[in-house]
């Protein structure tokens, strides 16, 4: 089967936003207009095609990013709908890694919400060109220009309007296209019928002003245009479009458009903008990677003629076909039934079938090409972030970084029958989600699950019951504390067993120093000279220290931000072994850490509360009582905003408290920001409780 669409006519985009900005509705409308769905699914009534897990339909939020293919104006648009809830940032991170461009959806009333900032920062990190779509223009309090200001001030972006709304709130009836200088007015409810008219008389001046701003912004990225513009020559529509595209791809501007997806207004022009201004796979720089054999840097150009290279960005368990691995092809082509190498794990995999996904139904395709996004059936060892490539042409593509979980709960099966099923189910779920971890507590034998927040773990427990029929009791959420040291020390570790039979001998001196937070977390330096510790025993010492760091000395929490330098030691010709040096390394670390002024660290969350003016005092008082540090207070619309840093330990059950304090009118969002030392009196309580 040959390619349906040339690579230049492919768009891989993500739709990203804060919860409730209307992201899933927007995707639904795109699918409707591109002829993929015959009846529009509303999120309100739990029928949206992109939200296909039961939990999503009940909660009205998107949890997993579904990938869908649509067609518009002779282009193929692959869309990934990403979740906007902070507990699921990993899904967003994953999607952005494999996209070429994105549409950021903002609510015209709320503007830039905290989650929009997080997602925007993630997109900045990957240098993703994006369009901003200001949605919900029909809502009371809709303000397009305030949305533009917030994109500029809160996100530090350079927003440039390429459309203006005609009216707002219930008078929102169309848009003015600043490129063509025409007005598009919608006639029917489905928005498929619209007419192009002249600009309304009361908007002529405003349109001129914003068109000038647009021309100025795009002329800056093109010298020839700049000359034409300065000499007062009229620029053609085509020239303006090319210039907008160029500036958008260079991430110099963010074109801003508007609409109301729910009322079906503005979605077709959003599709036009995706095709006109967002990159094709051929517009983005070649993907970087490393050759695993030589360690040298390598790259793949987006072309069918290059060797095959793809990145698996999501694993899902499907009730019908088993394990599905979603992947993005960066170069080359792949036929179903062929073999590829998982270069990250060094294992050969057979691709059984290749499926093209449409939110929750699928079609089987014989072959994928560069730039495609599809799902493979039959990959046994592949997990999120792995590279799949041609066996003759090895490369490992740059993977993704995932944050450590910050909250954990003990979970136990209700019956013996549930016990066996629970193990299998949890391992499948942790395969799907790299921020969800499962471990067994050595002291109590309990199974501990850890994740990014209360909602994250709630949904996991819910899925256990629905998908895997496992009934489980869940303990109270616990905070993932960590430990570190505050001063540098030198310490000795000596492990000697020499009474009869083969002896053991390992002896080391190490220096421990605190590292800055936010860095690598652990660093090992070998300063052995003259072979006092033979080379083959260096790595075991490192491993011994790493193992000892897993169980901190204050309360058994993981230790972080430590640099260990091995600088002296001794060995025995006969009795020394890797095991002996591993134990010596671990002993030296424990001895040193005791003396290095160890402290307990706790996760601090950035909390943003939005409340009506009259509850402001209560909310601030409450945050202070939770050991919160108020950072700033501001206004958004007619509500007040309080930003604070609060320890996670004090935030359990906050949703209920806030509801009762503000009679249900306050909302909040929180996300993990950093770790900080626990105040001494509180740390003593935590340590005593752990040692019980």
Curated annotation (Swiss-Prot):
A GO MF term: GTPase activity
Entry's Gene Ontology BP terms: ribosome disassembly
Disulphide bridges, residue numbers: none
Annotated residues for binding of GTP: 17-24, 81-85, 135-138
Domain of life: Bacteria
Boundaries of every tr-type G domain copy: 8-282
Keywords, sorted A to Z: Cytoplasm, Elongation factor, GTP-binding, Nucleotide-binding, Protein biosynthesis
Annotated CDD domains: EF-G, EFG_III, EFG_mtEFG1_IV, EFG_mtEFG_C, EFG_mtEFG_II
Protein's UniProt keywords contain GTP-binding: yes
Keyword Transmembrane helix (UniProt): no
Family label: Belongs to the TRAFAC class translation factor GTPase superfamily. Classic translation factor GTPase family. EF-G/EF-2 subfamily.
Name of the molecule in the record: Elongation factor G
Record organism: Desulforamulus reducens (strain ATCC BAA-1160 / DSM 100696 / MI-1) (Desulfotomaculum reducens)
Name of the gene: fusA
